[in-house]
């Protein structure tokens, strides 16, 4: 018999020898959320990049409210700080309940549950563990307590446990269900989270009922009706984590991925927010004209760095999928600066040169072309500087006639406008 027990002990020890350290577990933790940073390192957009599960950054015990810690420990393992991994008294009570009253209930400690999280072989199949699994779980929990501190065990438990649906970890559950970080959890919220650990997908009425019982056991001054209301409002069918910052959805979708969950950009968060606000205000002013989309790209002229990238400031549900910065469309006034630059470079005009902004009729192969300004008004003689800053169309057409369409096309191609593939005659006055 002694030989048999020795062999069993050696087998158990060999199985547990590969148990990871706390630092290993923490280092392997991967959030499902990507984060886009601006040029100063400030978060500018959060985006889910992994579809399996829902996890946030690892939550430390110091970042969890005292109410949440005390409530969860009381609900899950009230003698957690006094046992060596196994609560033999709780196991005896559970065995008696099963034997005498046929009311099976669990007696797994937090340490035992962490051991199961770390070793798939210890997890139950079809809601039940075999006797050998239970024994291995007990042995694993006791071994875990020899190398891990209580704080490390509790911290790991609160990060690896599933609370609701796909929400793994207290950080994800707190944000999704209550819209706050774990440091701000109050007593009623902590009661709901504590009972969710044993029934993550229970209906709100059942969760509220068990939370009410837990409050009574703890002598917590929380009314049952308050817990019922909180459960109804906080436990939707499909809980979701709202991003804390969402200023650059199009850039985030282009740059963030499971392999690149954290990317620093040249964007400036303040300028990005300001550009978005300006576009939204302009869209609101143009609401009567049925204008629903607007985009903006702001570059640093000296370095070429992108400082703001608003792909679409529209409010429609499809706006985040339509990137107006990249979408092919008419050039509008975006080519005018290059046109005037070429004219000045060739000494055809200066910034102070006067250009006639008056009606003009131009003959083209497709018929008569009569350029108009945006406001349908003409300003008369204006400087090239004013014509460009006011985005006047007629002076731009007159400048194009000075430069020549073919020369301007060649300049655009040199500058990297790869979409300009035809000769000057093909584009004609539309280049201005």
Residue ranges of predicted features:
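Short pre-catalytic segments that frame enzyme active sites
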Residues: 42-57, 168, 172, 253-259, ...
């Amino acid at each position: 018999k002694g030989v048999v027990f020795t062999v069993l002990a050696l087998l158990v020890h060999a199985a547990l020898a590969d148990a990871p350290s706390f630092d290993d577990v923490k280092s392997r933790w991967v959030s499902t959320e990507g984060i886009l940073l601006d040029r100063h390192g400030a978060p500018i957009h959060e985006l889910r990049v992994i579809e399996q599960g829902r996890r946030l950054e690892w939550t430390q015990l110091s970042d969890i409210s005292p109410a949440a810690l005390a409530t969860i420990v009381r609900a899950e393992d009230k003698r957690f700080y006094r046992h060596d991994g196994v609560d033999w008294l709780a196991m005896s009570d559970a065995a008696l309940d099963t034997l005498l009253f046929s009311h099976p209930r669990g007696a797994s400690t937090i340490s035992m549950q962490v051991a199961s999280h770390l070793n798939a072989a210890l997890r139950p199949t079809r809601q039940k563990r075999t006797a050998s699994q239970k024994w291995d779980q007990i042995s694993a929990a006791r071994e875990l307590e020899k190398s891990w501190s209580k704080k490390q065990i509790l911290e790991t438990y609160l990060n690896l446990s599933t609370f609701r649906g796909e929400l793994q970890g207290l950080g994800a559950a707190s944000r999704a269900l209550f819209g706050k970080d774990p440091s701000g959890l109050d007593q009623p919220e902590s009661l709901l989270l504590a009972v969710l650990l044993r029934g993550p997908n229970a209906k709100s009425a059942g969760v509220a009922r068990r939370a009410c019982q837990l409050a009574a056991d703890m002598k917590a001054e929380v009314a049952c009706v308050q817990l019922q209301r909180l459960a109804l409002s906080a436990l939707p069918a499909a809980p979701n984590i709202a991003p804390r910052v969402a200023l650059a959805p199009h850039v985030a979708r282009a740059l963030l991925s499971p392999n690149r969950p954290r990317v620093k950009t040249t964007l400036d968060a303040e300028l990005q927010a300001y550009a978005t606000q300006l576009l939204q205000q302009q869209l609101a002013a143009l609401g009567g004209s049925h204008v629903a989309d607007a985009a903006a790209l702001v570059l640093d002229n000296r370095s070429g760095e992108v400082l703001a990238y608003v792909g679409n400031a529209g409010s429609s549900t499809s706006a985040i999928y339509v990137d107006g910065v990249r979408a092919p469309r008419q050039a509008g006034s975006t080519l005018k600066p290059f046109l005037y630059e070429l004219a000045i470079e060739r000494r055809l005009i200066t910034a102070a040169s006067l250009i006639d902004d008056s009606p003009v009729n131009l003959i083209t192969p497709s018929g008569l072309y009569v350029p108009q300004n945006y406001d349908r008004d003409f300003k008369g003689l204006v400087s090239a500087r004013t014509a460009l800053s006011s985005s006047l169309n007629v002076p731009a057409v007159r400048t194009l006639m000075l430069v020549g369409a073919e020369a301007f096309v060649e300049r655009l191609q040199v500058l990297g406008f790869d979409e300009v593939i035809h000769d000057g005659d093909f584009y004609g006055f539309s280049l201005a």
